[in-house]
Swiss-Prot record:
Belongs to the PsbB/PsbC family. PsbB subfamily. The gene is psbB. One of the components of the core complex of photosystem II (PSII). It binds chlorophyll and helps catalyze the primary light-induced photochemical processes of PSII. PSII is a light-driven water:plastoquinone oxidoreductase, using light energy to abstract electrons from H(2)O, generating O(2) and a proton gradient subsequently used for ATP formation. InterPro entries: PS_antenna-like, PS_II_antenna-like_sf, PSII_PsbB. The chain crosses the membrane at residues 21-36, 101-115, 140-156, 203-218, 237-252, 457-472. Keywords: Chlorophyll, Chloroplast, Chromophore, Membrane, Photosynthesis, Photosystem II, Plastid, Thylakoid, Transmembrane, Transmembrane helix. PSII is composed of 1 copy each of membrane proteins PsbA, PsbB, PsbC, PsbD, PsbE, PsbF, PsbH, PsbI, PsbJ, PsbK, PsbL, PsbM, PsbT, PsbX, PsbY, PsbZ, Psb30/Ycf12, at least 3 peripheral proteins of the oxygen-evolving complex and a large number of cofactors. It forms dimeric complexes. It comes from Anthoceros angustus (Hornwort). It comes from the Eukaryota. GO terms for cellular component: chloroplast thylakoid membrane; photosystem II. This is Photosystem II CP47 reaction center protein. GO terms for biological process: photosynthetic electron transport in photosystem II. One of its GO terms (molecular function) is electron transporter, transferring electrons within the cyclic electron transport pathway of photosynthesis activity.
């Protein structure tokens, strides 16, 4: 039988043994990829500077997912938070990678076994002796087992009852660590930024799944519903499974892009909305005003700002700044951050403090404009010097640095002032090493951007797959060419392939 490439899956349509085999092989490939990718990332990951060169700047993709579940130590003697480790144990990054690779091998062997021993009595109807699957019963079993797993994760792993807990941090991504989380059963549990909601929702969903599984194991579907939803057809299973997967993909694309407790910024990088809303800038401003209220000097106030917080307030860490087709990590774009130069304060010759207008997310270039505290334009870098009125030279702008490496240093040279004004457009000013990785200076997206793009794209494709297979199973008789005016109630091709001349057309 010659099948076109897009129809090859027909070979497992009525072959439950080999259907199991191909699913085992698929799981083996997924598990093997995860373990291998983890080992590759560990081989290229530099853990030496968790503040200025975190995992998300280095383009790590699977390490953040391991970390948010409680893995923080490596057999290489380092931990994600910067401490030295002597005995990482089996539940280290390498340990988890090895477990996935071993599991992949076992699944591979199981897939081969099921491919060879495909014709098991388990899959045959005792009454007819033909291959058949009790799909509603299988659905109940799967629902029950996934409910147990979901409940176990929420009740034991996340809460720390039997497990490490999950990664928890403050809203500004400064104090993150793995810790047990108590379930949040009130309205706050529905806040996507409250970690307790992860525990309570898994517990609640798990209980619901267990009860629903038991229901489907003990209650048979009515005949009208069974036939109406084509519950005897394995393509119905495919269609509804695709629906579950694309729905989950859309949800996680949203929680990743907009941010949530499940996608901490220390592991995946900040969101674009934190730049758009000046989230970190406002927190820095609040801290400076608080320090000034304690009669600290500007230099002392800015020196108290954590370098980590200042680094978040830099447009190069915005995942929406990198083009989707610019391959590579953020470090391959603007370079490896070496140090914070300090906060630049601009003043004109009349003593007005000037603020550089920050570049919006979707601009590649943006005019350099300096405004006073009332929003009045006082200086700029003109496009045409012949018509300029507010140039740095004419207005006499100087720049002073507070905190960071240039603390207390000021510049009045127009060329230098303009250089720092351009860089202040991009947020706090940092020094970057572009030589080590031959970085090209073009912004890249973070794993947050890649994950969102990938899952949103595949969710859309899977949505069409759901429609396609759902239509095929619901209108199977129409597509098979059965006369719609046929008086006899016929169950056509329930367990046999379409076009099989031995298929019985039995009047029900």
């Amino acid at each position: 039988m010659g099948l076109p490439w897009y129809r090859v899956h027909t070979v497992v349509l009525n072959d439950p043994g080999r259907l199991i085999a191909v699913h085992l092989m698929h799981t083996a490939l997924v598990s093997g990829w995860a373990g291998s990718m983890a080992l590759y990332e560990l081989a290229v990951f530099d853990p030496s500077d968790p503040v200025l060169d975190p995992m998300w700047r280095q383009g790590m993709f699977v390490i953040p997912f391991m970390t948010r579940l409680g893995i923080t130590k490596s057999w290489g003697g380092w931990s994600i938070t910067g401490e030295t480790v002597t005995n990482a144990g089996i539940w280290s990054y390498e340990g988890v990678a090895a477990v996935h690779i071993v599991l992949s091998g076992l699944l591979f062997l199981a897939a081969i076994w099921h491919w060879v021993y495909w014709d098991l009595e388990l899959f045959r109807d005792e009454r007819t002796g033909k291959p058949s699957l009790d799909l509603p019963k299988i659905f109940g079993i799967h629902l029950f087992l996934s409910g147990v797993l979901c409940f176990g994760f929420g009740a034991f792993h996340v809460t720390g009852l039997f497990g490490p807990g999950i990664w928890v941090s403050d809203p500004y991504g400064l104090t993150g660590k793995v810790e047990p989380v108590a379930p949040a059963w009130g309205a706050e549990g529905f806040d996507p930024f409250v970690p307790g909601g992860i525990a309570s929702h898994h517990i609640a969903a798990g209980i619901l799944g267990i009860l629903a599984g038991l229901f489907h194991l003990s209650v048979r579907p009515p005949q009208r519903l069974y036939k109406g939803l084509r519950m005897g057809n394995v393509e119905t299973v495919l269609s509804s499974s695709i629906a579950a997967v694309f729905f989950a993909a859309f949800v996680v694309a949203g929680t990743m892009w907009y941010g949530s407790a499940a996608t901490p910024i220390e592991l995946f990088g900040p969101t674009r909305y934190q730049w758009d809303q000046g989230f970190f800038q406002q927190e820095i401003d609040r801290r400076i005003r608080s320090s000034k209220a304690e009669n600290l000097s500007l230099s002392e106030a800015w020196s108290k700002i954590p370098e980590k917080l200042a680094f978040y307030d830099y447009i190069g860490n915005n995942p929406a700044k990198g083009g989707l087709f610019r391959a590579g990590a953020m470090d391959n774009g603007d370079g490896i951050a070496v140090g914070w130069l300090g906060h630049a304060v601009f003043k004109d010759k009349e003593g007005h403090e000037l603020f550089v207008r920050r570049m919006p997310t979707f601009f590649e270039t943006f005019p350099v404009v300096l405004v006073d505290e009332e929003g009045i334009v006082r200086a700029d870098i003109p496009f045409r010097r012949a018509e300029s009125k507010y140039s740095v030279e004419q207005v006499g702008v100087i720049v002073e640095f507070y905190g960071g490496e240039l603390d207390g240093v000021s510049f009045s040279d127009p060329v230098t002032v303009k250089k720092y004004a351009r860089r202040a457009q991009l947020g706090e000013i940092f020094e970057f090493d572009r030589a080590t990785l031959k970085s090209d200076g073009v912004f890249r997206s973070s794993p947050r951007g890649w994950f969102t793009f990938g899952h949103a794209t595949f969710a859309l494709l899977f949505f069409f797959g759901h429609i396609w297979h759902g239509a095929r199973t619901l209108f199977r008789d129409v597509f098979a060419g059965i006369d719609s005016d046929l008086d006899a109630q016929v169950e056509f091709g329930a367990f046999e392939k379409l076009g099989d001349p031995t298929t019985k057309r039995q009047v029900v």
